């Protein structure tokens, strides 16, 4: 599947989230946040996503690997809520759709709304996506919303 809006999504992140590529969590806090996301997702008997978190050195990209069922973050720039939430949104989208398509953007936006310290509103997210010419699916139809909207996971305690 062609990833037609990848560069648009990256540009949007860079403008919407100040210091996107700046570390703001420790490795331990990334693990705690990841564990809370996993606990929230797997809290229902009908959902079981086996996923691990790995850290590596280097200046390349961070990624989600569906085949290995892991999220990989870089020590030098990937230790932040926004990068972890970006990669977790890929895991929720699970390769069924375009990598940075509407489903991914909706999942990522909901995760930012719920778990980023600034808690951007859906209105703010939609306006910024519109301004960046990024397509998205309905936030409240996303898997992230269905799973996490009523979950009181303690991500704030992770950081």
Which residue ranges define each predicted feature?
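Active-site-proximal or metal-binding-adjacent scaffold patches in catalytic folds
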Residues: 1-82, 91-159
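Walker B catalytic acidic pair
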Residues: 87
């Amino acid at each position: 599947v062609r990833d037609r809006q990848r560069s648009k999504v990256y540009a949007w992140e860079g403008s919407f989230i100040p210091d996107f590529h700046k570390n703001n969590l420790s490795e331990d806090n990334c693990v705690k946040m990841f564990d809370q996301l996993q606990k929230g997702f797997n809290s229902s008997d009908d959902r079981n996503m086996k996923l691990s978190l790995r850290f590596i050195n280097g200046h390349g990209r961070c990624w989600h690997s569906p085949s290995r069922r892991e999220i990989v973050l870089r020590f030098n720039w990937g230790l932040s809520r926004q990068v972890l939430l970006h990669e977790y949104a890929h895991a929720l989208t699970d390769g069924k759709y375009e990598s940075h398509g509407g489903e991914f953007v909706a999942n990522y936006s909901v995760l930012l709304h719920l778990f980023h310290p600034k808690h951007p509103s859906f209105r703010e997210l939609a306006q910024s996506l519109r301004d960046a010419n990024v397509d998205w699916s309905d936030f409240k139809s996303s898997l992230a919303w269905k799973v996490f909207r009523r979950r009181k996971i303690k991500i704030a305690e992770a950081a």
